[in-house]
Regions:
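Bacterial N-terminal signal peptides
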Residues: 6-16
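Sec/Tat signal peptide C-region and signal peptidase I cleavage site
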Residues: 18-21
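CBM-like carbohydrate-recognition segments
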Residues: 23-72, 76-124, 177, 266-267, ...
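Short coil/turn linking the two alpha-helices of tandem helical-hairpin repeats
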Residues: 77, 137, 193-197, 253, ...
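Extended ligand-binding groove/face enriched in aromatic
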Residues: 85-195, 202-206
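Active-site cradle of extracellular carbohydrate-active enzymes
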Residues: 172, 179-193, 201-252
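Oxyanion-binding "anion nests"
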Residues: 241-256, 261-275
Length: 375
């Protein structure tokens, strides 16, 4: 029995936590419908940041949360198009009309729905969207999504320069180069390379991947947060950063069939399971309370399971989903921000980004029908 499976088994025995392996599509639809009921402004085709609404806050959420929600809606439209395909179209229109800036030197999505001429743009926000647009195109074959993916990726790649030997900046102020702006850009480039046979995108992915490994990878295989233009490395290890490098290496393996890429992906995934698995619960929330980061690591583990058929990866994701459902869900089907132990203040508002991460996680598990962990 491998260490990860042993840990999950021990957690169940010691805590008495009954597995809640159930219909993940039902859970995904419940989470998605909760968001539509409590966060969505249908006339504006945009999402509010919290529920209950905070009267002191901006009326709509920032692009980071929208990006997570967009990925959840894309998955929803894949698995239940009759119910959610129109929502995908409407939400796409709402983002484009409110957040897309066609007047920028290189058009891209603003951080907030401030309209044309905005000066607050994040390269990472746009990189996540480029990946999502590519996914939407794969699912629907609607050329508008491929067009959006290419346009958005063009903006992200404009954030590269040779300061610090290369790399893409985090945002327009050009103060730091972050793993969260580089790793999803490399993955987006490879998705586009798969879809269009664009060799330039493959070249970009390889260049970004090389810079990341030489600049922001720790000896254990995991990735630090960022490096400032003064050369100072911020060494927090967010799970979503390593997750996107794992996905990048898996895409490289699919395109180039180099065993070293698959080995690198497995090494990072195994190091991540060791680093982020909470020994008290078996969840992936040892160092992070929020699912907004771990959902990306879960997706990376599922993609690695697809490639290797190693059940420790899917078992970890199932356990994470079941843990979140058990500790962070309220009786109405919404999710609290804290997935580590579910504790929250009585007056705490629920946030769009955490609920979107929950919905995305459950949608990711829909195609995996085996209800039992591999123990």
């Amino acid at each position: 029995m491998n260490m990860t499976v042993f840990l999950l088994a021990a957690v169940v025995l010691l805590t008495g936590a009954a597995p809640v392996f159930a219909d993940y599509q039902k859970k995904a639809e419940e989470a998605t419908d909760y968001i539509q009921t409590h966060f969505y402004d249908a006339p504006a085709k945009r999402y509010r940041p919290s529920f209950p609404v905070d009267p002191k806050a901006l009326p709509y959420d920032f692009m980071w949360a929208n990006g997570v929600q967009y990925s959840a809606v894309i998955a929803a439209a894949r698995w239940n198009p009759a119910k959610y395909r129109k929502l995908l179209t409407d939400f796409s229109d709402g983002m484009e009309s409110g957040y897309w800036d066609p007047q920028a030197p290189v058009p891209g999505f603003n951080a907030y729905c401030s309209g044309p001429g905005g000066t607050d743009k994040y390269y990472d926000d746009n990189a996540w969207l480029a990946i999502s647009f590519a996914e939407a195109y794969k699912n629907t074959h609607d050329p508008i999504f491929l067009k959006r993916a290419r346009e958005t990726q063009k903006f992200v790649l404009s954030g590269w320069d040779e300061t610090l030997g290369g790399g893409i900046f985090w945002k327009l102020d050009h103060h730091s180069k972050n793993t969260c702006s580089n790793s999803p850009t490399a993955a987006a480039a490879l998705h586009l390379a798969q879809l269009t046979k664009d060799k330039d995108q493959l070249a970009w992915a390889l260049k970004i991947r090389e810079w990341l490994a030489g600049t922001l990878q720790d000896k254990d295989g995991l990735y630090w947060d960022c490096v400032t233009t003064q050369g100072k490395v911020e060494k927090t290890k967010w799970s979503y950063n390593t997750a996107m490098v794992i996905q990048t290496d898996l895409l490289l393996y699919q395109l180039q069939h180099r065993p070293a890429d698959l080995r690198a992906a497995r090494r990072m995934a195994d190091a991540g399971l060791t680093y982020w698995t909470d020994p008290a619960t078996g969840s992936l929330q040892k160092t992070e309370k929020s699912p907004r980061f771990t959902v990306y690591f879960c997706e990376a583990l599922l993609r690695l399971y697809d490639q290797t058929n190693d059940k420790k990866y899917i078992d970890a994701v199932r356990h994470q989903a079941d843990h979140g459902y058990r500790v962070a869900r309220d009786p109405q089907g919404g999710y609290w921000d804290n997935w580590k132990d579910g504790s929250h203040h009585p007056d705490e508002r629920k946030s769009l980004i955490e609920n979107a991460a929950a919905a995305r996680l459950f949608w990711l598990l829909v195609p995996y029908t085996d209800p039992n962990p591999g123990m």
